[in-house]
Amino acid sequence: KIGYVPQNLYLLDASLAENVAFSQWGKTIDEARVKKCCQMAAIDFLADLPEDIHTVLGERGVRLSGGQVQRVGIARALYDNPDLLLFDEATSALDGAAENEIQTTISSLRSSITLLIIAHRLSTVAECDIVYWIDKGRIIRSGAPGEVLPEYEATLHQSAFSR
């Protein structure tokens, strides 16, 4: 099973529980599972919600910050207990502080789930075990971040000054 956290998450004008259990729409929601996924996704704003997981989030999650929306996306992806969790530019729309919070959340999941992270921000992949530098569909280099990222940065720097 694969869980997916997109760059732009769509939230329903529904409760937090319904948004987390979105993949099981129409079925009975496992509230204990929703709470466990919220905990795993470091959703720390549950106590601030007037009706806990039953609080309606508003159209596209208007009552939440960008970082909170992404955490709901992570909880949603975790609800089906995936073997692999795919993050597709999941932090690109966030400011630095929110990105750091989400990075901490992602790091906490590394021990229990295989993570595949697609990102342009180098800080997003700096803690990964293996980094693949892909250009035009080809793997240019792979290895530990400490090996691949400096070479990638040097190439970016060189191409910026050769224009």
Model-derived features: positions:
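ABC-family ATPase nucleotide-binding domain "signature/switch" substructure
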Residues: G3, N8, L16-A21, C37-M40, ...
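Catalytic strand-loop-helix junctions within cyclic-nucleotide turnover domains
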Residues: K27
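Conserved ABC ATPase "signature" region
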Residues: A32-D52
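ABC ATPase nucleotide-binding domains
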Residues: H157-R163
